[in-house]
């Protein structure tokens, strides 16, 4: 189960429980486009607490560009007093609009859930890791903002 979404793995130190019934979409909302992660929340099942991490200005330079069948993530990280590009990864994906599940090619058993999608905001949730080691996977929620 170590099929971790590489670009998010370094950033995912946080998540909040969210109900899939809260899915919100506008007429022209689409995951297609360029996004950055504004914040990440990790809801830990062991203590029922949410840890929130907001993106630094350097982390906001990291982008995730969704095209019709693949996504390219460009990662930036601080190095000394500079913000440098550290990685570029392109992966094929599938987005099922009926159930709002998103997964990478060959990883259907490790889905992400799009719980909100508007023209400017996207919320993606997963339950793939147990951060607090209590035997229950925790909920990681990533809040994306579209880049104009």
Would you name each region that the model predicts?
Residues 4-13:
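Sec-dependent N-terminal signal peptides
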């Amino acid at each position: 189960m170590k099929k971790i979404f590489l670009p998010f793995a370094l950033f995912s130190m946080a998540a909040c429980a969210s109900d899939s019934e809260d899915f919100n979409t506008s007429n022209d909302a689409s995951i297609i486009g360029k996004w950055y992660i504004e914040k990440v929340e990790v809801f830990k099942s062991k203590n029922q607490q949410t840890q929130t991490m907001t993106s630094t200005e350097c982390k906001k330079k990291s982008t995730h560009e969704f095209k019709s069948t693949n996504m390219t993530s460009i990662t930036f990280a601080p190095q000394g007093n500079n913000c440098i590009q550290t990685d570029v990864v392109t992966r094929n994906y599938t987005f099922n609009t009926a159930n709002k599940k998103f997964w990478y090619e060959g990883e259907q058993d490790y889905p992400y859930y799009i719980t909100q999608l508007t023209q400017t905001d996207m919320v993606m949730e997963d339950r793939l890791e147990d951060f607090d080691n209590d035997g229950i996977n925790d909920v990681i929620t990533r809040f994306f903002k579209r880049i104009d």
